[in-house]
Amino acid sequence: MIGCGACEPEVKMAGGQAAAALPTWKMAARRSLSARGRGVLQAAAGRLLPLLLLSCCWGAGGCTAAGENEETVIIGLRLEDTNDVSFMEGGALRVSERTRVKLRVYGQNINNETWSRIAFTEHERRRHTPSERGLGGPAPPEPDSGPQRCGIRTSDIIILPHIILNRRTSGIIEIEIKPLRKMEKSKSYYLCTSLSTPALGAGGSGSASGTVGGKGGAGVAGLPPPPWAETTWIYHDGEDTKMIVGEEKKFLLPFWLQVIFISLLLCLSGMFSGLNLGLMALDPMELRIVQNCGTEKEKNYAKRIEPVRRQGNYLLCSLLLGNVLVNTTLTILLDDIAGSGLVAVVVSTIGIVIFGEIVPQAICSRHGLAVGANTIFLTKFFMMMTFPASYPVSKLLDCVLGQEIGTVYNREKLLEMLRVTDPYNDLVKEELNIIQGALELRTKTVEDVMTPLRDCFMITGEAILDFNTMSEIMESGYTRIPVFEGERSNIVDLLFVKDLAFVDPDDCTPLKTITKFYNHPLHFVFNDTKLDAMLEEFKKGKSHLAIVQRVNNEGEGDPFYEVLGIVTLEDVIEEIIKSEILDETDLYTDNRTKKKVAHRERKQDFSAFKQTDSEMKVKISPQLLLAMHRFLATEVEAFSPSQMSEKILLRLLKHPNVIQELKYDEKNKKAPECYLYQRNKPVDYFVLILQGKVEVEAGKEGMKFEASAFSYYGVMALTASPVPLSLSRTFVVSRTEVLAAGSPGENKSPPRPCGLNHSDSLSRSDRIDAMTPTLGSSNNQLSSSFLQVYIPDYSVRALSDLQFVKISRQQYQNALMASRMDKTPQSSDSENTKIELTLTELHDGLPDETANLLNEQNCVSHNKANHSLHSEGAI
């Protein structure tokens, strides 16, 4: 600097020695301070000293303008441009190797040669240790009270020989950072400045021209000679003097190639993770099931997966090893791109967890069969690639853990699985009940399903098989009935209803006779017998009914067998199907809850057919009365329930004159009394043959055939429509009308044998031809109004003794009226009274003229005792 005596006389030096006076003054100030304020002065000296010098020079007026001979003062460095590899961190510059960095130099008289006064060293500035300081005393002085020389100037940082000036107070220099040595991750360098401008003029090329602290060109007292040519370099006394050079960030691969590899590895990671869950979740048992009963696509998938899945441990080791290798490589590549900080952790976690774990496992958990089958070639490839490592480990696992069997369900688990999956499977409720019942068969005993003894229908062994007993058996609806003697628990025999097929109730056969003849074996079982064992016994065909007993050892005395109830095959089947089997004879829906069955129809009451001797003149059995009643109600439309109630029909059949007998006379086969119907003779009654044979002659051709029991005739006599029979109509019938009326297309239905429905008339023309001569001679007796007359065109003659039903039109009409009254809602007393009055009119009513005419022509006289045909007059 130029001389400045007013401010600092000791600092006046020539040429390059002015810069060296600054540290000397600072060191003198340090020695004059107390130990307590030493640190503060030390921190402020380096920054405030240049400013004090400048203010001193300007204030005293002794400082000259800056010129070419003015010394350069360097205050500090700052990083000009910051980026990913060059930045400020904690007051130090952090740069990367193999880079060029621009630094801004701050100071006074910055010129084009300032770059040559800056250097860096690898050695850190020496600091006093606590042991070198006195406890409570002042710090030991610096060596010879001079500045510290820099160590060897490093060659790793090269100062490029140019500077960009800015107002002589700052400039921009550029440095080049060379590569670090091997095994070095980072390295610290420290700023040094020279006391003179190197290689500049006579006074600056070799050494300092003045002395500092009484020493000559040897440099700072107490230090070895300067190592760099003849220039003295000292540590820069400031805070921003440290530069940290870090390792250059290198990518393992080019960036674009790394992105491709990362994407591929993410896909492989997801595949391994998904296959690990999807394939290992498919146990061998499930794959076999799918192979046998899945869809065609599922069968194909299972067939491709099953050989690989059979080697479970080998597959598991291959998938896990591949997954670990892929994830490790992926982590390294992501770390190389994102770095090793928090960003790298977040990126790696998101990439692996979301795209490598969550997404593929969510897909494979639902579509593992399809994904595993479509990627089976990749699975086999990686199993081959990892064979050296995964196969030995898998064999070790096989030896330690044993063979993999798969998921096996016992009865309880299978039943619970069906219940839990009920909303999602296609089983209907009945199918599910049957499956549950079959699975629970071995867990239940016969005592759980048996019918208790008190609720069983049983018959005493002393019973007589008359109509009352057999009716009771039929009404019970059971096919196998236990027979007891004395107490109900003493079951000695078994009666099958089919055993009564050849039993006549009129014979009053003792029950013991039937049971001893058939001698059905009794089957006893204990109350703890399982239902599956009971079903096997029933399947052997020994019996479909078993008697349940238990050993009673309660109380005093010897143990004995106690009968609890009976169990049937139907009970076991009902337990399997979880539903009650009801037929038309069941009384209860369940033999335990005793819930009544709601029958849609009235139950048949066989007691109505139990007749007394005084009710009928002709003795018939209750069975025949029942058969006759059912035949008329079902086969003859005129007596169907829609026309006449069954109760009224039964009362009609029980009237004394409805059922009649006719004794056949062998000597006089064609006597008038042997004819039930004669051709062209009007009648008003219906006939049903019960026993015997008749000969029917029908048509103009006189065709003859025989008929027997349950053939009937004269239905139209009961329901014949009114026919106009006026005298004028009778005598004006022409031959043409007769022929026209007798055309083959009109209602011709000759009588049929074998109990089939017989026609009432062959043709309307035949009836007209027959009516003309008969009614023409009786025109004085008949009115010109309508007459309900039925004229058969056939003859019915007895061929043997007959027993038949004969119902007149009047009786039928009264019965119809009684049926209508029976259906009309009214009090029961008035109803029964009116019905009885109506039925009484069947024989109390006065016959009209037509009835008298019919009676005269068809009444049969009693020629022999006990061989007569009852008069067909109104009942």
From Swiss-Prot:
The keyword tRNA processing does not apply. Changing N527A: No effect on N-glycosylation. Residues 121-149, 741-763 are annotated as: Disordered. Glycans are attached at N112. Widely expressed, with highest levels in kidney, lung, spleen and testis. In the kidney, predominantly expressed in the distal convoluted tubule and, at lower levels, in the connecting tubule (at protein level). Gene3D superfamilies: CBS-domain (3.10.580.10), Jelly Rolls (2.60.120.10). Isoform 1 and isoform 2 may interact with each other. Divalent metal cation transporter. Mediates transport of divalent metal cations in an order of Mg(2+) > Co(2+) > Mn(2+) > Sr(2+) > Ba(2+) > Cu(2+) > Fe(2+). This is Metal transporter CNNM2. It comes from Mus musculus (Mouse). The gene is Cnnm2.
